[in-house]
């Protein structure tokens, strides 16, 4: 394809909102692409199946609860039950359904990466630039792979100020009928509200139960239920 033809296609995609040009003059995916992805997710029923359970956990815990899926090297936020408790606004980060965050420094991203086939996981990590976001961001790819091994063994993921200072979160996997991990649920809190240990020990079981209920709505059954 000639350069002039490619340029015409790019200009057309920009005009339609599927590409946008940043200050560096490099192109990135536009909001229309996110709209397409959200429409596809709506068609699967994932948001509809999860919404009631997310809201129930928000009420029970008084913390913000999120549902996300892996999209390339990012976590795409699919649904969000936002807490209005004092202090939660400090870690809100302006997130909403359709928002994206790097998978490597989020609890949902880590649980989703940990459950990928090994070769696919290595390819994705190879594409990542592990930029420091918070005080404890993992910036070594080997350290990230080691962390993901621990996450897989534990069955849940923890974010200890890896995305931003004072932000704690924990995440659990959502599985479908084929037993594949297709999404993740997480709960986030400011460090002034609860310790990470309390978040894991006191609220972790409720988070896992919520993820299990959503999984059941998607047709997943544990071995002892088959």
PLM segments and residue spans:
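N-terminal helix-turn-helix
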Residues: 1-48, 212-220
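Short amphipathic alpha-helical/adjacent loop interface patches that line ligand
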Residues: 3, 10, 33, 54, ...
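Residue-level recognition of specific faces of alpha-helices
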Residues: 12-18, 32, 66, 77, ...
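Short, ordered coil/turn segments that flank beta-strands lining enzyme active or ligand-binding pockets
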Residues: 23, 71, 177-178
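Amphipathic alpha-helical effector-binding/dimerization core
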Residues: 28-127
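Cysteine/selenocysteine-centered motifs that mediate thiol-based redox chemistry or coordinate metal-sulfur cofactors
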Residues: 120-123, 128-129, 208-226
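Intrinsically disordered, low-complexity polar/acidic regions
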Residues: 133-135
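Extended hydrophobic
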Residues: 137-213, 226
